[in-house]
Regions:
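Carbohydrate-associated surface elements
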Residues: 159, 176-177
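Nucleotide-activated donor-binding/catalytic signature segment of Leloir-type glycosyltransferases, i.e.
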Residues: 230, 239-272
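Acidic anion/phosphate-binding donor-loop and adjacent secondary structure
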Residues: 141-144, 178-194
């Protein structure tokens, strides 16, 4: 394809809305705009317009030049997707034509992170470069079908790429990136805090958190202060979540724990500064329920950028890098995670030695979104 990613009109298709919490698709949109492209971030569609008309608005996002947010509501029933998919896609093609017209003309690149097959590549007219970028595990045929028609596929795990071998498009591993807000902060010399501060960031309304193991660790470590960033109410989340009684009970237990602080969602730049205060980080997902199946997580790069030790459930992408992450070996349970946490915290000076902190920071800096775009550009 021999494409450069400068001076292009790019449509980013995201299954998560723009908001306080940022994931890969949000960071790629920002970095592409900084690189001199006109970038349009397509939010998931809102509820159907009962007046029978498409509602489309395009507003500037102030975080980068020439970065635009597309808010839209379809004029046909969304439930058609589940009962009459060919008709849904036919109507969606018409809707997308209106979106492209509202943008002001054809786009040069369609960059899709969508696993819901809302907008098959064949619905777009012209000859844009079609990039498919799944960052979560494809759990059903709909997610696999979402890659059909792509010119090239990128993913953050080799396991995900293997599932798209059914298509002729070449697939390439590109690790999660780290945003400029994190990589630009120079870590200072570390001194252990009293009490030790352990950081956790993410969406705490997700159903794949291993709440039992996490609460056990918190209870068994009363001398450690656990600081949580991210949504703990579904209403505050722009990246999904669940509001079932089990999650509500989990959040209440966190709120009532004397060694827990819930900060809620904050902007990336502020989060970067807060994470640098930490002595260590904890990741605790149930791999069997996890949307990434314990293969990779976006937050890992952000944690590594601080240089501090990470204690985690098993993550296959880093299984051969104990210098980067201290993880358990088991894939079917986290029963040994509390013991691992205790062992690492007990020897935190060793795990946060200068050489290890420098290695973690160096790894993160080699995976900035700017560098990931350079790698992607070389493959186009």
């Amino acid at each position: 394809m021999a494409q450069t990613l400068t001076g292009k009109r790019i449509l980013i298709i995201s299954p998560q809305s723009w908001g306080n919490m940022s994931l890969s698709k949000h960071h790629y949109a920002i970095e592409l705009a900084r690189k001199g492209n006109a970038v349009y971030f397509l939010n998931p569609p809102g509820e159907e317009n009962t007046r029978g008309k498409a509602a489309i608005s395009i507003l500037p996002l102030r975080v980068a030049p020439d970065l635009w947010l597309i808010e839209h509501r379809i004029w046909f029933p969304y439930r058609l997707k589940f009962h009459a998919l060919p008709l849904f896609h036919l109507l969606m093609k018409s809707h997308l034509s209106r979106v492209i017209k509202k943008i002001g003309g054809p786009v040069d690149v369609i960059w899709s992170f969508d696993l819901g097959n809302l907008y098959p590549f064949r619905l777009f007219s012209g000859r844009p470069v079609k990039i498919f970028h799944p960052v979560d595990e494809p759990l059903n045929q709909v997610a696999i079908d979402s890659g059909k028609g792509a010119d090239i596929i990128f993913s953050v795990t080799k396991e995900i790429l293997e599932k798209y071998n059914v298509f002729p498009a070449p697939g390439h591993f590109i690790n999660h990136g780290v945003a400029e807000e994190f990589s630009a902060k120079v870590p200072v010399a570390w001194e252990k805090s009293f009490p030790i501060h352990v950081g956790l960031s993410g969406n705490w309304t997700r159903p794949d958190i291993d709440t039992a193991s996490l609460l056990r660790i918190i209870r068994e470590q009363p001398a450690v202060l656990f600081e949580f960033w991210g949504s703990y109410q579904v209403a505050d989340s722009n990246i999904g979540g669940d509001n079932n009684p089990a999650i509500e009970k989990f959040i209440r237990e966190l709120q009532y724990s004397s060694n827990v602080t819930l900060h809620g969602p904050i902007p990336s730049a502020q989060l970067a500064a807060e994470l640098h205060r930490m002595d260590a980080f904890l990741i605790c997902y149930d791999v069997q329920k996890d949307q990434s199946k314990g293969t990779n997580y976006h937050k890992v790069m952000e944690y590594l950028s601080t240089g501090k030790v990470i204690i985690s459930n098993n993550i296959t992408t880093y299984r051969d890098r104990p210098d980067l992450i201290q993880m358990i070996q088991e894939r079917d349970n986290n029963e040994k995670l509390p013991d691992l946490f205790n062992a690492v915290i007990s020897r935190i000076e060793q795990h946060n030695a200068d050489s290890l902190r420098e290695a973690r920071v160096s790894y993160a800096i080699d995976n900035t979104y700017k560098k990931q775009l350079e790698r992607i550009e070389a493959l186009l």
